[in-house]
Amino acid sequence: VLSPADKANIKATWDKIGGHAGEYGGEALERTFASFPTTKTYFPHFDLSPGSAQVKAHGKKVADALTLAVGHLDDLPGALSALSDLHAYKLRVDPVNFKLLSHCLLVTLACHHPAEFTPAVHASLDKFFTSVSTVLTSKYR
């Protein structure tokens, strides 16, 4: 459960990210593919080379979904229901991959905003990404 302090940290961080969310999403996705090569199996039709337009575009989709979630911290299941359906029923993404991408998102944000990435912000973002991952995998059961 996200506390009021977590929600404030998440919103403040997302405000600082601003227009870079899509860029960071693409970078985090590239980092995920490089660090965890098995995640590439879900994208056989993509050019997965560094700087690929397809990876950047999908990274922007990830960032857009997270931006939507930031705007609905009190109702993540409602906000992400369609995305949960897509990943569970159509794409059938292994739930562990959300954890791997979440880790790479944290690393990417820490690299770009080291001064703002305090232990409290790190913990809040980790809880947020875990909450989003939980919602996205909730329909697997």
Swiss-Prot record:
SUPFAM superfamilies on file: Globin-like
Keyword Isomerase assigned: no
A GO molecular-function descriptor: oxygen binding
Highest taxon of the lineage: Eukaryota
Residues given in the record as heme b binding sites: H87
CDD domains listed in its UniProt record: Hb-alpha-like
UniProt entry keywords in alphabetical sequence: Acetylation, Heme, Iron, Metal-binding, Oxygen transport, Phosphoprotein, Transport
Tissue: Red blood cells.
Subunit text: Heterotetramer of two alpha chains and two beta chains.
PANTHER family listed in its UniProt record: HEMOGLOBIN FAMILY MEMBER, HEMOGLOBIN SUBUNIT ALPHA
Protein name: Hemoglobin subunit alpha
Organism: Procyon lotor
Name of the gene this protein is made from: HBA
